[in-house]
Amino acid sequence: MFEEHYRYLESIQNRRDYIEDQIQTGSPVIGLVYDDGVLILTLTSSQKLYEVHNHLALSAIGHTADIERLRLLVTDSASVQGFQSSIDDVTLHRLTNFVLCPPIKQSFESVFNPPTVAKILLAELGRLNRPHQLVTVNYDGTTSIQKHIAVIGGSEDIEELMRDYIDQTDAGLSDKLTLQDAFELAIQTWAVGRLANQRSNPEIQLGAEVAGYDVERLNQCLQTELIELYVEAGTLQTSKRGKSKFRSLTDQEIASFLPFEISGDER
């Protein structure tokens, strides 16, 4: 009996190691509350940001097939719930705890079946005097709820470093940021996460002091990455008219918000 329990724990740890190895190089995703809603930003080579429902949005890192399966699951569930009852019943809490987490947790603990290789970030625009909310769902089904900032990255160390970078600015804890301020902070935080993952560089180590990530260094990282990737950013916007509060930032907006000009080689 003891031996079987040990083997199960060993299998769980092996699954954890496998998943973390698979998502280690994933492009970070940052969610920030600003003065007119919530911004979600990442750099990518293909779409990673989706509207879930009128006031809900999702992004993720991991295996594309797993992300798409979970996206469809939560989007379909939100649509059915909104149709059968009320849009007020379509909440981040309900979708996270009763739709997303159970199958993710089950697949992680079922050691004879493939695990779900994905980390998810969801955002909810506050309504009916409820505050904006950000939630991250880990590959094992555990969640973290935040009111101002949320990040997902290739490892917990990278995520901690990105949060530390935002915390040192004090801006990440305020809902008074303009959209441009939030964009600049989010994209610089993305660069911090990207640099932290470059273990081949002896100057960059996980857990390094965030003070070492000066703006010039971050901008150089972004300019290099934008040769192969593009910025994908979207907002859940309080002032937007209509039922849907989600919108993607235009190429013109992104270009105007970047702290440098994009050359012809950059996307």
Where would I find each of the regions flagged by the language model?
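Long, low-complexity N-terminal extensions
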Residues: 1-267
